[in-house]
Amino acid sequence: MIASHLLAYFFTELNHDQVQKVDQYLYHMRLSDETLLEIAKRFRKEMEKGLGATTHPTASVKMLPTFVRSTPDGTEHGEFLALDLGGTNFRVLWVRVTDNGLQKVEMENQIYAIPEDIMRGSGTQLFDHIAECLANFMDKLQIKDKKLPLGFTFSFPCIQTKLDESFLVSWTKGFKSSGVEGKDVVTLIRKAIQRRGDFDIDIVAVVNDTVGTMMTCGYDDQNCEIGLIVGTGSNACYMEEMRHIDMVEGDEGRMCINMEWGAFGDDGALDDIRTEFDQEIDMGSLNPGKQLFEKMISGLYMGELVRLILVKMAKEELLFGGKLSPELLATGHFETKDVSDIEGEKDGIRKAREVLVRLGLDPTQEDCVATHRVCQIVSTRSASLCAATLAAVLRRIKENKGEERLRSTIGVDGSVYKKHPHFAKRLHKTLRRLVPDCDIRFLRSEDGSGKGAAMVTAVAYRLADQHRARQKTLEPLKLSREQLLEVKRRMKVEMERGLSKETHAIAPVKMLPTYVCATPDGTEKGDFLALDLGGTNFRVLLVRVRNGKRRGVEMHNKIYSIPQEVMHGTGDELFDHIVQCIADFLEYMGMKGVSLPLGFTFSFPCQQNSLDESILLKWTKGFKASGCEGEDVVTLLKEAIHRREEFDLDVVAVVNDTVGTMMTCGYEDPHCEVGLIVGTGSNACYMEEMRNVELVEGEEGRMCVNMEWGAFGDNGCLDDFRTEFDAAVDELSLNAGKQRFEKMISGMYLGEIVRNILIDFTKRGLLFRGRISERLKTRGIFETKFLSQIESDCLALLQVRAILHHLGLESTCGDSIIVKEVCTVVARRAAQLCGAGMAAVVDKIRENRGLDTLKVTVGVDGTLYKLHPHFAKIMHETVKDLAPKCDVSFLESEDGSGKGAALITAVACRIREAGQR
């Protein structure tokens, strides 16, 4: 008993010594994590070189665009054919993908041989042979009468220019067909099929096997965005952001990049990592100096590396007693399969002995232990190198997405990964150590290359179908020049109806007289108070207007809130609160008890009877103070001032914010005779000839008309321009049937239009993989600021995804492009409609004055106009196009409503004083 224990101990020690000896000998092949991270860093640099336009020609890692722009989302369906050509045999496959809630793939396939004489004959012979095999397969399945889409896996070095165009760079793997190199292989197949004339197919995509692997796995796991092959050769692909791919135009979306990573190190980047054995393998290969990384990791070379190490150790008398056999000296006699077998057996030492005996050697126990260890070191290095380059790819994807923790799946194929007993496990373990902030899943591809080509085709079909469906839906929102001219014409008609005494009562565009009869002329001076009430906060302002050399406006203001109970209380309580705030402000400014002229911006629907008399028609914006509707707001304010008995104010003017905007800009630019607001709501005003303002007596001079143009279309005159989405937004609004024009152009509603379109797309499976989240059903989540952010040019899709994520919408890159497109279409229409309305206004002013050309300035305010990246530009272009005889400038108003009220007061005081003289 003791003897057997001693013997076992002796062998264990012996094995241990032998292992240490090999470890020391192959010290350079055992890579630390530090070294692997350094390799990952170098690989990152090589990736960037391959992607850059200027560095691509000299880059060793080519990073080739594949024109595959999306991975499967599980909704693909249909029948497809696939051809898989990558060696002496090729396969034809029929693939049916069904999506009825249960993703299912059915396949039929047949393998055809390519005879030696055809491989080395002409290209015409080769492609005729392929077409013949395809015809035979379709005959067998009785599908020759169908024109099916086909995906083609072509695993040779190619330059791809489109999804269905791929030029062969050079034959490999023993092929020598003449007249094919430099040609597009898709054209060659198409011609061969046409020569036969007995069937037709639609060749949609050419892919290589790595992309096929990613796509096959992507159908089962939508997180799959990397494809990896470690077999006879090695390569990888991954989904890159379009903005980083200099060789392909366009910045939006993603595209799969075929890395061709086998060539990593061809420029010397791995010289300090490569060993003498790697150099020897390379020198004896068919392509010296090329594919150096592949030669360190792939199955074609793994057994050969082990053989070279054993030969050198034997020559140095470290193995086999210094003896060599002819078999051991013959290239290719130690196979990668032997490496797998030796490492796979529980008793690997015994397997090592079998292999060594087969090679004509007489190994000792130590020799077998050493051989086992050499196999381990070579295959472990291979897995570690793969992990290092994958770590670089994952880091890049993680940075592209800006995620703190990345969840990603790698689709894998290849004999080394699948058949070596420990390779996969070592690869997974090392990779997780190198990228601890990534959760990685590995998915083995079953039948990657053939099924993958069908999947690429299925995805291309799905994308094309979905694109067509989306364009059809968005078509009614895209307005032609003729349609915009018609909107302009109708706006003009509605303006006339609002101005006319006869039709005013029934006109939706009310064209209300404001009793503001002049814009500033620059001689205004004095101190004025202004009140600005249009929401839950209101402002009190002191505005000092100076003329002469010191001409300008100086402002002081303070914001006060209106508590909910005051908004919903009595009118007296509301106006007492306002007067209390004025008193506080005057004290704050050190002007207690001073009497000043006051201008009042009151942004609620009113009927104005004179400059200082304005009857509130109805409260909006959540106000409900009783006893105010039907009353003159100036009287209510004056009564509250008298009740306080602390100061007296001369209320000179009541205006709305649009008029305020025009007056503020009019102080800077005497040509300013139009005011426009495009923010939460939208409205416009302009200087109309008194003779046309039939509601007010007098023919001389001009008066500013508050158009209330948001109600344009309330009589149905815009129904042929309104879409189902406009109708849906209107129905669910607080004032259904009212303010229809405003609902097509203003910030409060654009987000809702977008949300309704997105819901429609999602219901039809065109977006968010057909899943409607609770958030998407929530009204009002798409604020205007998000529309502005999403359309911002400097924002990458990554940030669009972040905005959608913030809104609780999980989106793919493709989804983000679609959301951006919808936002663009909706905002563009809004800007064009606004421009058409404005063109009607400026043309009316020109015609009123009988001018051939008019130079006029529009004062503008509002968040949509100011913050949206494209709204203003599109609106300006539209006005220019639809009113070519008007030279229109746009001036952004700074603080229109408060300052404007003070300026109207200043103008009124100037005119009053002139009248008194």
Curated annotation (Swiss-Prot):
Q: Which InterPro entries match?
A: ATPase_NBD, Hexokinase, Hexokinase_BS, Hexokinase_C, Hexokinase_N
| Residues holding ATP 2 | 532-537, 680, 747-748, 784-788, 863-867
CDD domains given in the database record: ASKHA_NBD_HK2_meta_rpt1 (cd24125), ASKHA_NBD_HK2_meta_rpt2 (cd24128)
Annotated region Hexokinase small subdomain 1: where? 73-207
Residue sites binding D-glucose 6-phosphate 1 per the record: D84, L85, G86, G87, T88, D209, T232, D413, G414, S415, S449
Q: Which residues bind D-glucose 1?
A: S155, F156, T172, K173, N208, D209, N235, E260, Q291, L292, F293, E294
Catalytic reaction list: a D-hexose + ATP = a D-hexose 6-phosphate + ADP + H(+); D-fructose + ATP = D-fructose 6-phosphate + ADP + H(+); D-glucose + ATP = D-glucose 6-phosphate + ADP + H(+)
Residue ranges crossing the lipid bilayer per the database entry: none
Name the Enzyme Commission number(s) assigned to this protein: 2.7.1.1
Subunit comment: Monomer. Interacts with TIGAR; the interaction increases hexokinase activity in a hypoxia- and HIF1A-dependent manner.
Q: What does this protein do?
A: Catalyzes the phosphorylation of hexose, such as D-glucose and D-fructose, to hexose 6-phosphate (D-glucose 6-phosphate and D-fructose 6-phosphate, respectively). Mediates the initial step of glycolysis by catalyzing phosphorylation of D-glucose to D-glucose 6-phosphate. Plays a key role in maintaining the integrity of the outer mitochondrial membrane by preventing the release of apoptogenic molecules from the intermembrane space and subsequent apoptosis.
Q: What is this protein called?
A: Hexokinase-2
From which organism does this entry originate? Sus scrofa (Pig)
Point out the gene that encodes the protein: HK2
